[in-house]
């Protein structure tokens, strides 16, 4: 049976569900960076990524650069990577996109996770240097994933259906706003044509039509047509309504409040929901491993 959260030696959770659901758990760390990897899971995959980023770090250190400090905020909604001073979000890794998380058993400060980028759909490996709490951070990410997955299952699709309805209504509102703009443009054109038609030629001596006190041509309704009686003396049948869709004088379909419910969900949002479900099904693997025999030297 596929489990959402998998660790070889499960440990009891260290945070309450409320802390991760209603708030977040903060951690301070130093960010070695991220690099693209070929696979969403695998110990060897993250080992290669850690070695690569450590090598890049040694080069930057020789140039006098320091590791940037970051703040991690872990909750059931994801792992945020922020600037500790300005609180500006640098990365926002959603939990269903995180597929692998590991901490180094020889170097207690190093931990890493693999997350699928939301724009490029590439798998990126993030590597951090923490204050000897790498294992605690990986377990916290695992607990957050476990709670988020359970919440997703307990919703029974209700959250998805609610989002579909909201998305359908938002699309309907957008269509109505677009229709409103087009109607305003057509109305402006008709008003301009009406003004041009009412202005007489410059040298015309033709008699003017009678106007009211506002210098407007008075409205004269047409004489209503009286239906002729049938040959047998009975009243004629009412005119048949056209079967085609009714349209207003601007050629637009009239608003129908009964059709503005949950419309078909836009393909882009539907694909995101499908991807979210697929990510939770893939699960999160958390492992404790040995990345390399050369711990990060001269941390600064």
Swiss-Prot record:
Chief localization: cytoplasm
Alphabetical UniProt keywords: Apoptosis, Coiled coil, Cytoplasm, Phagocytosis, Transport
Pfam families: PID
GO cellular component: cytoplasm
GO biological process terms on file: apoptotic process; phagocytosis
Coiled-coil annotated spans: 160-199
Keyword Nucleotide-binding: no
Role played: May function as an adapter protein. Required for efficient phagocytosis of apoptotic cells. May play a role in the internalization and endosomal trafficking of various lrp1 ligands.
Protein name: PTB domain-containing engulfment adapter protein 1
The gene coding this protein: gulp1
